């Protein structure tokens, strides 16, 4: 894509921690590979995650931030959120218990259910950005899974003064 005049960037990593990297180091991947701007999509609060501890998750975020600082890149960690009642607990602990700012962690799928959405508004009001996921069959997801419809969620976020992004994925 870059050769065709488009800008294309990516993350290093995987759902699980320890993350899979190209150089065996998050910091090295971000510093040495031009297109890598952060780490993701790390799964937490979900049955698909590796159930990382606070220390493991905080280390991934810290390494990603360090790689970003040293390379002049974003150093963002994109975090896949499931529908566990723990919601953003690990993310909030990193922000509250370390020197890493909320702006370094981008939780996605925040409209997965009403409880998670409410917690995400609180997180965004503390300085974090959040990411919606637009789904194909919105009636199904809203009715069966308690998902917050993107258009309604965006309005609620904007009314609260929050910063939002919308994730579009080719595979759902």
Model-predicted regions and their roles:
Residues 1-56:
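Divalent-metal coordination cores built from histidine and acidic residues
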Residues 49, 56, 62-155, 165-170:
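Active-site core of metal-dependent hydrolases
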Residues 156-160:
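Redox- and metal-dependent alpha/beta enzyme cores, enriched for Fe-S-associated oxidoreductases
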């Amino acid at each position: 894509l870059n050769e065709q005049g488009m800008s294309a960037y990516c993350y290093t990593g995987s759902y699980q921690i320890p993350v899979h990297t190209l150089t065996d180091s998050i910091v090295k991947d971000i510093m040495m590979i031009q297109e890598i701007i952060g780490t993701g999509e790390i799964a937490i609060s979900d049955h698909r995650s590796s159930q990382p501890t606070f220390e493991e998750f905080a280390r991934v975020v810290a390494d990603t931030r360090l790689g970003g600082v040293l390379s002049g890149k974003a150093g963002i960690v994109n975090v896949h959120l499931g529908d566990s009642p723990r919601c953003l607990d690990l993310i909030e602990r990193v922000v509250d218990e370390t020197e890493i700012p909320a702006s370094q962690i981008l939780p996605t799928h925040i409209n997965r259910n009403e409880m998670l959405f409410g917690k995400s508004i609180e997180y965004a009001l503390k300085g974090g950005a959040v990411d919606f996921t637009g789904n194909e069959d919105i009636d199904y997801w809203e009715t069966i899974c308690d998902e917050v419809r993107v258009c309604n969620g965006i309005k609620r976020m904007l009314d609260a003064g929050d910063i939002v992004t919308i994730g579009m994925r080719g595979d759902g």
